[in-house]
């Protein structure tokens, strides 16, 4: 039986923790390392991480000491862990920590390494228009996501799937891959493969400014941007409801390139120009219009775009930029 320390923080890490804790034939989760309690939600109430809440539910010990503190190494060694499983923990581990466990630290990364190393692999894959992505389990070394790979699994990206939906699928798929990789490690049959040298796309974190939509691009590019930025940080644009300089923020969480065969589909919209009918809201792009499906105005709840438009009192010439 492999004695495992689990390190993770957000909801996406919980399926892996549960799978390892459930498989008592092969694993003993000796402790859980997670980020400190932090302000959460609109009320900014101090809350434990999803991983910490799951660990409590499972009756597992939680290490409160920060890995950067000197006390951490002694706390780590006291667990008797042989290796560590890491899923979206959110902190860089110093070399002395990586060397403290006899079998090392292993990370579940949500891309097919070496492609999309970095903080936002799922979002970047969608934004780039990738049709296939997946999960990789690799040994953590000094370089960012560059250690030898123990195993990979692939999934097809749905044509209308957003980053949150895809990440949920990868979290479930990756939990099985992580468990299988650690079991192979324990049995001595793992085949770790060095990542090939070369230049690969880096998955930089998507900022709020990155999520600002520009409409002088094709409709398919905006569709990818919206799906990549949903649920966070959320794609947005400046709405000019009266066609003048006055503006407010409009978030868009779902849209599709317009069906140009439909009778109501508009023609010849300028980039950013809005066209509204009873059941549809379109915005012009550099190619075909983009139909807005789900939006959220400032201070309002998320709603269907036609419902929003009925209450927005849009004037002739209203536009987004």
Swiss-Prot record:
Q: Which cysteines are joined by disulfide bonds?
A: none
User: Molecular function (GO) terms listed?
Assistant: methionyl-tRNA formyltransferase activity
Instruction: List ligand-binding residues for (6S)-5,6,7,8-tetrahydrofolate.
Output: 111-114
Whether Amino-acid biosynthesis counts among this entry's keywords is: no
Instruction: Give the matching Pfam families.
Output: Formyl_trans_C (PF02911), Formyl_trans_N (PF00551)
Record InterPro entries: Fmt, Formyl_trans_C, Formyl_transf_N, Formyl_transf_N_sf, Formyl_transferase-like_C_sf, Met-tRNA-FMT_C, Met-tRNA-FMT_N
* Name under which the protein is recorded: Methionyl-tRNA formyltransferase
């Amino acid at each position: 039986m492999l004695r495992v320390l689990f390190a993770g923080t957000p909801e996406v890490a919980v399926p892996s923790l549960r799978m390892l804790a459930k498989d008592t034939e092969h694993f003993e989760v000796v402790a859980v390392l997670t980020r400190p309690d932090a302000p959460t939600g609109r009320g900014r109430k101090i809350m434990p991480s999803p991983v910490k809440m799951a660990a409590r539910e499972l009756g597992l010990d939680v290490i409160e000491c920060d890995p950067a503190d000197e006390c951490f190494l002694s706390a780590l060694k006291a667990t008797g862990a042989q290796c560590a499983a890491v899923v979206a923990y959110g902190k860089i581990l110093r070399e002395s920590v990586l060397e403290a466990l006899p079998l090392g630290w292993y990370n579940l990364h949500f891309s097919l390494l070496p492609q999309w190393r970095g903080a936002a692999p799922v979002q970047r894959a969608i934004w780039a228009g990738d049709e296939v992505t997946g999960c990789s389990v690799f040994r953590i070394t000094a370089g960012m996501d560059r250690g030898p790979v123990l195993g990979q699994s692939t999934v097809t990206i749905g044509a209308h799937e957003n980053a949150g939906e895809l990440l949920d699928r990868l979290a479930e798929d990756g939990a099985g891959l992580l468990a299988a990789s650690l079991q192979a490690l324990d049995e001595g049959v793992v085949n770790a493969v060095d990542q090939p040298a070369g230049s690969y796309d880096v998955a930089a974190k998507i900022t709020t400014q990155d999520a600002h939509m520009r409409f002088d691009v094709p409709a398919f590019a905006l569709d990818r941007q919206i799906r990549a930025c949903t649920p966070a940080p959320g794609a947005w644009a400046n709405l000019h409801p009266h066609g003048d300089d006055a503006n407010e923020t409009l978030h868009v969480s779902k849209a599709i390139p317009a069906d140009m065969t439909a009778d109501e589909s508009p023609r010849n919209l300028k980039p950013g120009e809005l066209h509204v009918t009873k059941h549809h809201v379109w915005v012009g792009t550099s190619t075909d219009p983009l139909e807005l499906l789900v939006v959220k105005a400032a201070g309002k709840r998320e709603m269907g775009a036609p419902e929003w438009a009925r209450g927005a009192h849009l004037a002739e010439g209203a536009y987004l930029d």
